[in-house]
Regions:
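A conserved beta-strand-loop-helix scaffold within acyl/acetyltransferase catalytic domains
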Residues: 20-81
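Alpha-helical elements of Rossmann-like donor-binding domains used by nucleotide-donor carbohydrate transfer enzymes
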Residues: 14-17, 21, 102, 106
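Conserved acetyl-CoA-binding loop-helix of GNAT-fold acetyltransferases
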Residues: 85-109
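Short, high-confidence coil segments that cap the C-terminus of an alpha-helix
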Residues: 46, 113-116
């Protein structure tokens, strides 16, 4: 693993700076990091972290409480272009895997230490295989498994809210529907 550090963000000003970087990027979900929307979201985070190597930002994400002792880790995960896995191949090409090696393990351990069950999700059914691969790459002691259905991670009327989930528990209270 690279010499990287996960740091907790405690001030909204630094959080806003990170959102500005992501919202101006060519990230497929750049609009998710709209500064005004993210300012409103700040108080929903139990923690928000960034991954750096030296002074270089690599990735960031937060943990959101979903109620009933369940949290979403790696919420609004952003990774700089040069550290992203850009192709849906079976082989992980980039040796630095920010989510798998740093963000998800750090968030999960933080949450488990406080008695939470965890999940992370990925949009779109066509990306389900990449979720399965990330679970295989994670330390098995974290306890993640891919759940069989799609789950509403936000408003169930919005098709983008129905997502694939990997979780440390099979007891998910989110609305679900079978994959057709």
């Amino acid at each position: 693993m690279e010499n990287c550090i996960v740091q907790e963000i405690t001030y909204i000003d630094e959080y806003i700076e990170l959102c500005e970087i992501a919202s101006k990027s060519n990230h497929p979900n750049a609009s998710n990091y709209n500064v005004d929307k993210m300012k409103k979201r700040w108080n929903k985070y139990l923690i928000f972290t960034k991954l750096t190597r030296g002074n270089e930002l690599i990735s960031f994400a937060g943990i959101v409480d979903f109620g009933n002792n369940l949290v979403r880790v790696a919420d609004r995960l952003y990774t700089k272009q040069e550290y992203r896995q850009n192709f849906m191949t079976k082989k992980v090409i980039n040796p630095l895997r920010p989510a798998v090696d740093y963000i998800i393990p750090y968030h999960t351990q933080w949450a488990i230490d406080r008695g939470y069950d965890c999940f992370y999700s990925i949009q779109e059914l066509k990306k389900r295989n990449s979720l399965i691969r990330t679970v295989k790459l994670l330390n098995p002691n974290l306890g993640y498994s891919v759940l069989p259905d799609l789950y509403a991670t936000c408003n169930p009327k919005n098709p983008r809210c129905w997502q694939n989930i990997a979780s440390t528990t099979k007891n998910i209270h989110l609305q679900s529907k079978p994959i057709l």
